[in-house]
Amino acid sequence: MHHVQEARHAPAVELGASIVDIEIGTTKLTPAMNLIKGRASCLVSHHDFQGTPPIEGLEEIVRREISAGADICKVVTTANSPDDNLTMLQLIARFPQVRLVSLAMGNLGLASRILCPMAGGDFTYASIERDKESAPGQITVSELVKIYQMVGAWGTET
């Protein structure tokens, strides 16, 4: 997946990206999406690096992403409380027909990262190796697989 902030970065599709992440606040969102649509899935994202707003505000963000034409919606906040995990998972439940990634960053957001796909979210994020994380609180793929295996959410053949 490639992250696009301006239409000039759309060549990610030429590099073989199957999903391109475009921030909802991108000034040239529509032209960027027009370059991508039909060639890759458009993931329209929102990141809040300060905290986790009330669920009503998060719902409005998802509605804006849907209106923008997102194939996949992504809402990522920063957990300042363990309760923020529940808020992010509740967001998934409120949009059952939408491909949605909803999780919280930071150490306090770990539960939402792990549970997002188990709660109906489209997928989650993990780093390939330690110290290569793309966001605070991200765990490695191998750690995530071990957790999923322990709770019976992943086959043991890995």
Region annotations inferred by a language model:
Residues 14-19, 35-44, 66-72, 95-98, ...:
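Glycine-enriched alpha-helix->loop->beta-strand junction motifs that scaffold or abut catalytic
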Residues 9, 32-33, 62, 113:
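Generic hydrophobic/aromatic pocket-lining and core-packing "Φ" positions
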Residues 7, 60, 86, 90, ...:
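Short, contiguous clusters of charged residues that form electrostatic/catalytic patches at enzyme active sites
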Residues 56-72, 143-147:
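Ligand-binding grooves and catalytic loops that recognize ribose/phosphate and carbohydrate rings
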Residues 92-158:
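C-terminal alpha-helical cap/extension of soluble enzyme domains
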Residues 9-29, 43-54, 71-81, 101-104:
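Catalytic beta/alpha-barrel core
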Residues 1-11, 54-64:
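Short, acidic/polar
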Residues 24-39, 53-57, 80-94, 110-111:
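Active-site-adjacent beta->alpha loops and helix N-cap segments on the catalytic face
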